[in-house]
């Protein structure tokens, strides 16, 4: 009790929100089991302002909701999501933005990180640049903690359940009956893209009542093993630790087997863990060289691969990806395109460009994604599969000049902010 009180006192003195690990709002209520999927269990005004180290956000109101969801074994969970209201916003247009948390630790979750600008929360701070662009369109935004209370990065189906139940909860928050004319678009980058696509795949059976107009995603990861092999011995080697730790959080058999291939590594947010393992050899170094060929490890990874499921999105998908992405191999995108487009009813547009790295690709593709979503609100006709090559996705037709300028200048600002990126090389 003394330690708990001391932590609360310290948090109050420093004027930062309570860490989710000691914040009772993140704990499920006693009536969790009697609630329905998507029910709002608790809600509150955002304890502290949403704060970005890069941009000002056009926010009129911000709330956090706790929503009933479930894990991959259908066990009940309480998921926290953040709802952001823009000035003069249109409540009938909702973006579910899946942040690229990429971390197996609750204190890295978007609901907390967007209130605490720091090196530890840098990935969510960068994502707030994109969220600001969405709010400037007059769209409501919900940002789910889709990894859940156990931080199960990168578990596909639980991510999907959390996303869909957070949308349900947001609609119920504004309309207690849950019946509304709200149109929702899914948006995400990096693993946020994977969560968005899994949500689009399971939605017809899991949440058929939701009116999803489409999913706009960038740099998705169709094959986790190929991703691991690509980032190993590079600046983002630490992501391999986060992937293994996140899967271990969800699957006990995976955790028990992983120990045979190396000691369990510390939990951490994306950038601190990448700094710790900067350019280290992970497979055949930190972990035994045979870790990816072990049947338990391999099977657990495969069930979370987009390429391992025959189910396909039943809503239109816009996917932007650089041919030169240094983290998610473009060959895997082509495999996904072939798999999906071989099936009837798939509506997929791929915007391929020549952005020279993962971060630049995010900024060049996001204005195209927003432009594509704007057309989806208006039910513009789409059909079949389309794959277009461009030098840069800044050249995507119809992008508003102010939107292009906002993302170009934001990219330059992030590149110039060396005091954060330099941390990864120390």
Curated annotation (Swiss-Prot):
The keyword Glycosyltransferase does not apply. It holds the Pfam family LIP. SUPFAM superfamilies: alpha/beta-Hydrolases (SSF53474). The keyword Lipid metabolism applies. It is an enzyme of class 3 (hydrolase). Glycans are attached at residues 74, 175, 179, 223, 378-379, 422-423. Induction: Expression is not induced in medium containing Tween 40 as the sole source of carbon. Expression is up-regulated during the yeast-to-hyphal transition. Expressed in host cecum and infected mucosal tissues (stomach, hard palate, esophagus and tongue). GO terms for molecular function: triacylglycerol lipase activity. One of its GO terms (biological process) is lipid catabolic process. It catalyses: a triacylglycerol + H2O = a diacylglycerol + a fatty acid + H(+). Secreted lipase that is able to hydrolze both the neutral triacylglycerols and the monopalmitate ester Tween 40, allowing the use of hydrolyzed products as carbon sources. Has broad lipolytic activity, which may be important for colonization and subsequent infection, therefore contributing to the persistence and virulence in human tissue. Belongs to the AB hydrolase superfamily. Lipase family. Class Lip subfamily. This is Lipase 7. The gene is LIP7.
């Amino acid at each position: 009790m003394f330690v708990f009180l001391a932590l609360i006192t310290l948090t109050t003195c420093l004027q930062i929100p309570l860490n989710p690990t000691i914040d009772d709002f993140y704990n499920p209520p006693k009536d969790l089991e009697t609630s329905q999927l998507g029910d709002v269990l608790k809600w509150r005004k955002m304890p502290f302002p949403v704060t970005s180290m890069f941009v000002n956000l056009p926010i009129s109101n911000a709330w956090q909701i706790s929503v009933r969801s479930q894990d991959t074994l259908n066990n009940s969970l309480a998921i926290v999501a953040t709802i952001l209201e823009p000035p003069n916003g249109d409540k009938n247009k909702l973006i579910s933005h899946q942040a690229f948390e990429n971390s197996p630790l609750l204190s890295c979750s978007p609901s907390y990180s967007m209130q605490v600008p720091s090196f530890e929360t840098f990935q969510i701070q960068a994502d707030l640049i994109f969220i600001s662009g969405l709010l400037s369109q007059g769209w409501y935004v919900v940002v789910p903690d889709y990894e859940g209370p156990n931080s199960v990065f990168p578990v596909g189906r639980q991510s999907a359940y959390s996303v869909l139940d957070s949308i349900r909860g947001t609609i119920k928050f504004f309309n207690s009956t849950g019946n509304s004319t709200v149109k929702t678009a899914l948006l995400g980058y990096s693993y946020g893209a994977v969560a968005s696509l899994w949500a689009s795949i399971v939605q017809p059976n899991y949440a058929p009542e939701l009116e999803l107009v489409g999913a706009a995603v960038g740099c998705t990861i169709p094959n986790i093993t190929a991703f691991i092999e690509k980032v190993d011995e590079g600046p983002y080697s630490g992501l391999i630790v986060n992937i293994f730790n996140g899967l271990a959080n969800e699957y006990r058999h995976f955790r028990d087997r992983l120990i045979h291939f190396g000691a369990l590594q510390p939990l951490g947010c994306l950038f601190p863990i990448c700094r710790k393992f900067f350019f280290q050899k992970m497979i055949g170094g930190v972990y035994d060289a045979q870790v990816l060929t072990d049947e338990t490890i391999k099977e657990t990874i495969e069930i979370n691969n987009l390429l391992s499921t025959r189910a396909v999105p039943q809503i239109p998908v816009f996917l932007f990806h650089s041919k030169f992405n240094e983290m998610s191999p473009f060959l895997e995108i082509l495999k996904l395109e072939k798999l999906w487009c071989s099936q009837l009813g798939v509506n997929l547009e791929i915007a391929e460009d020549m952005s020279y790295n993962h971060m630049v690709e995010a900024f060049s593709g996001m204005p195209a994604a927003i432009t594509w979503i704007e057309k989806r609100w208006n039910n513009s006709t789409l059909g079949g599969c389309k794959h277009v090559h461009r030098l840069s996705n800044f050249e995507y037709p119809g992008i508003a000049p102010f939107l292009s300028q906002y993302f170009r200048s934001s990219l330059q600002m992030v590149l110039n902010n060396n005091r954060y990126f330099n941390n990864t090389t120390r």
